[in-house]
Amino acid sequence: MLKAEGRTLIGGPVATSTPNGLAELIDDAQPFLRDHWRRRPVVLRSADLPTGSLTLDEADAALGTGALHSPYVEMVRTDRIIPREAYCTSRTVNRVDHPGYADAARIRALLHAGTTLVLRCVEQWHPGTAEFTRRLGRDLGRKVEAFFFVTPPGAQGLRLHRDDADVFVVQLNGSKQWYVHQGPDSPQWRPGPASDDEPPVVSPLLRTGEVLYIPRGFAHYATGDSGLSVHLSLTVRDIATADLQRAAQQLLFEAAPANRRPLDDDSMLADARALLEQLTSRLPALTPEQLLTAARAAQCAEALPQLSPGLTELAASLGAPPS
């Protein structure tokens, strides 16, 4: 369960106060958590955009340096695959050519031709976005990733598809027409392309400053409307059964001897007996809630720590050279 200021937020009674990261997306978290979280899509409005998240000016500057590299940079459209060579170039470092670096001129030309720009995993290379995703992740008890989409008017970057995540779409510029279809009807669903057998359940026109919430697995696609559409997709990852299996193995066998190589059958049988004894003693005490918490904690730990090499602190500690 998720706690905020000592109160259960998700998985129990609704909190009486809005948590930090979620407050930057939603004016009032209580109705959202009660009526929409993991249930159905909704358009939300917030007075402020996420603090410190990537802006269009910063994206322009990052692409202008040419330092961004594939796969952080991608161009997509529904009618054909855009090869990396169409929007990337080589950089020469120490007289060696290294391919795959963003080419600002090619990206601009493809945008004019109706192609969508995607900046992937922004939290891995933009400090402000990294800090916001950490705040939101703490509030929701999940791992959060960020993707930055730039779509020209009338263009569609991705086909109808399902994401293995809950998604908050934050419209930063222009507007975009969204079509959200129903979620999966069984736990055996797979992320990726989806069929449009049924009409969308909601089809909002998302404007600057609005936030669209799409529950995990709900199929969706979007087209650029007026102006240059820019949005930040905050993908809230959750675990699957395989994660529960790994967590169970870790909890049940965490104290078991590792890296042993018994040299005879008697020693091997003794180790097998010890493992079974540990399993039978630990299993009755393990609860489903503990297993779920451990699996989600392990997933959240996968997020990059965003550590700095501390060059400024190192310079200060060494002091200035004598004059």
Which residues does each PLM region occupy?
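Long, low-complexity C-terminal extensions of enzymes
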Residues: 270-323
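Active-site region of the double-stranded beta-helix
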Residues: 2-35, 48-53, 57-210, 218-259
